[in-house]
Amino acid sequence: MNIEQFQSMLEEKGITLSSRQLEQFEIYFETLVEWNEKMNLTAITEKEEVYLKHFFDSITAAFYYDFSKPFSICDVGAGAGFPSIPLKICFPHLKVTIVDSLQKRINFLNHLAQKLELSDVAFCHDRAETFGKKEGVREAYDIVMARAVARLSVLSELCLPLVKVGGTFIAMKGAAAKEEIENGKYALEVLGGDLKEMSTFQLPFEESERNILLIEKKRKTPKKYPRKPGTPNKLPIEK
């Protein structure tokens, strides 16, 4: 996906990028590739691939959810900033918090935010399991997002405790999402979530399947969740 295709395919979806926003994506790409030489941020480094599989793929969430309001967003395990930083570039009014367990990725994000001149961003070096217990962030976010972090039964325990009641958990998935939903239904129920919508589409050019799940937080999450680091993965909430 070249820059012209990136721009026009977003425009088709009602997202018009200014020259400054296009410049920010260019700086993002350059910074990602530069830092990737010193540390492993991504296996995808070819420009057209980065624009398609990282930038465009992240922004597809906005095709199914309206980001026009100044929502507070927590992005769990964002790695090199996906999906929340591409969304922040497109919708500068969003208030973004990223939680990642690796300090070196947090260092990269702090550097990136300076280069992109982003405001209203915070980067927290923490495990989602401990972050979700903290006062002030637990059940505090309008939206919590994660892209390809873990299967839904595990991911729900990391993300739903952070969503305020009435807010939305957006899970961005590849193929086989239907099977994940089957296995994850019980966890959603236990943690106070309700699957509202699942949108399936193909990522352009490579035609790989993507699924975006919109999960509404209906009830408070029981205090015992999330459990201690590593437990959600070892013993997922499944029947």
From Swiss-Prot:
It holds the Pfam family GidB. S-adenosyl-L-methionine binds at G77, F82, A128, E129, R147. The gene is rsmG. PANTHER family: S-ADENOSYL-L-METHIONINE-DEPENDENT METHYLTRANSFERASES SUPERFAMILY PROTEIN (PTHR31760:SF0). It is found in: Cytoplasm. This is Ribosomal RNA small subunit methyltransferase G. CDD domains: AdoMet_MTases. Belongs to the methyltransferase superfamily. RNA methyltransferase RsmG family. Keywords: Cytoplasm, Methyltransferase, rRNA processing, S-adenosyl-L-methionine, Transferase. Gene3D superfamilies: Vaccinia Virus protein VP39. Its EC number is 2.1.1.-. One of its GO terms (molecular function) is rRNA (guanine-N7-)-methyltransferase activity. Specifically methylates the N7 position of guanine in position 535 of 16S rRNA. GO terms for cellular component: cytosol. The keyword Metal-binding does not apply. It is an enzyme of class 2 (transferase). The keyword S-adenosyl-L-methionine applies. SUPFAM superfamilies: S-adenosyl-L-methionine-dependent methyltransferases.
